[in-house]
A protein has these predicted regions:
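N-terminal structural module
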Residues: 1-47
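Generic structural signal for well-ordered, non-transmembrane alpha-helical segments
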Residues: 3-6, 43, 72-79, 83, ...
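Hydrophobic alpha-helical packing residues
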Residues: 5, 9-12, 49-52, 81, ...
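Acidic interhelical loop/turn segments
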Residues: 17-27, 87-118, 150
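Short, contiguous alpha-helical
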Residues: 28-61, 109-144
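Helix-adjacent hinge/juxtasegments
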Residues: 50-88
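Short, highly charged C-terminal tails/helix-capping segments
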Residues: 144-151
Length: 151
């Protein structure tokens, strides 16, 4: 999904270029006044992916400052997230379905099996932020559709 989001960002960049405006305009866009901007959606998407992969595989997660303010910085953040995801060996995830993962869920300390963490926390949060990023760009007029989202 992060690679699909990257492709959507490529289309957004091309759309901005065709229309002669800076893709930096997308960075602060939001769907509603009380929602967080596009930059936050990319930060959260990459955070959800890295935290799941790190917690389950044991591979140390990179730290990111969440200071991206330009299109280039936001895109670089997504690329860094993709690089980390690709670097985690699949073998370190195999057989971890029952591994207990300590989490804080709604302010409560819990230990969930990795499969429950994936299905009830990591994926829903990840898809929420990826979808919101897509929706912000779509709302801005970027000509993308379901196939762009799903790949």
């Amino acid at each position: 999904m992060l690679s699909n989001l990257h492709a959507v960002m490529d289309k957004a960049e091309a759309y901005a270029e065709e229309r002669k405006f800076s893709p930096d305009n997308y960075v602060a866009m939001r769907l509603a006044p009380d929602m967080l901007p596009f930059s936050f959606q990319i930060q959260s998407s990459t955070d959800r992916a890295k935290l799941f992969l790190s917690r389950v595989s044991g591979v140390a997660a990179p730290t990111w400052a969440d200071t991206e303010k330009t299109w280039a910085e936001v895109k670089a953040r997504l690329e860094t997230g993709l690089d980390f995801a690709r670097s985690v060996p699949a073998a370190q995830l195999d057989g971890t379905e029952d591994k207990l993962i300590p989490l804080k869920v709604r302010g409560e300390e819990v230990q969930w099996p990795a499969q429950k963490y994936l299905l009830e926390n990591a994926l829903p949060n990840f898809f929420f932020h990826v979808t919101t990023a897509y929706d912000i760009l779509r709302h801005a007029g970027v000509p993308v559709g379901k196939r762009d989202f799903t790949g």
